[in-house]
Amino acid sequence: MSRDFLLLDGVLRQDALRWLYGAGEPIEVIPLYNGTRWDGVKELGPILVGLDSHSSLLGEWRSSLNLQRQASKLQSSATLNDVADHLSQFITIMDNLGSYSLFRFADPLVSSYWLGSYSPSAYESLLGPISEWLVALPPPNWAPSQSGEWQSYRPQTNSHKLKGKLNHLADDQVQALEQAYRRSFKERLYGWLIEDYPQTLSSLGEQERGQWLEQRLFDAEAWGLVSERSIAIWLERCACWGDDFATRSDSPYQAWLARTPGVQNLAPEQRIQALDEDCLAG
């Protein structure tokens, strides 16, 4: 008989184990980092929860946008251990260059982009004993009135098996995860900007906010910035001095260049961080 599971991301729900065990109902819980080299931080990894048919946790997940951002729902007729064993194959991933890394596949945003990057014929291999993987993809935080998406992934019978290891990411998957990261980064930037510099974005419509964020990211990257810190500094200067602060002849940035010897010879990352330090120093 098929049963429901929740797959929680421990980074997004750092009180997950306390919350689950405090629910006061029969559940089975397996942190997927159990017995691995990451056992010491298992509460921050993927956590699989087996539910009974009357679980209040399932109802809470269905009604809570916040919880849907932290967990997805699986269905399977297999045991909790069998589902956990299958999912454990994805704890680390490898790309075409041979690079290994930890994979936060339990983050619904990540799983949405990752699973969506495969053709439907891949799901029989990819999902294994899982008969459905249901992911809620809420609208981005800069466009809350947009409709969210429910994405259901199911295996197709008689599909060709995936070649190679399941945790190997081809170029399509790598690109999809880059898109997931970019959306997550934009949401974090928006949350910070709307709190500290609300005047920058509050007058824009939802679509315009997304376009503004994307254009500022593009500008920062074109200028040579790579790190999150430097890109955040760039957006802060845009909020304070205008979107064209780096090119406008009368901007405070040009005045700073003129009075600060040697900074023009710094690499972009060093230069924007030196600018930030001087701004903080007043």
Predicted regions located by residue number:
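A contiguous, surface-oriented mixed alpha/beta subdomain in the mid-to-C-terminal portion of proteins
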Residues: M1-E43, L48-S56, L74-N81, S88-L102, ...
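Non-catalytic terminal regions of proteins
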Residues: Q70-S72
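Short amphipathic alpha-helices in soluble, non-transmembrane regions
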Residues: R62-S63, L87
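Short acidic, gly/pro-rich beta-turn/loop elements at beta-sheet edges
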Residues: G59
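A surface-exposed, charged beta-strand/loop segment in the N-terminal or early-internal portion
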Residues: L65-L67
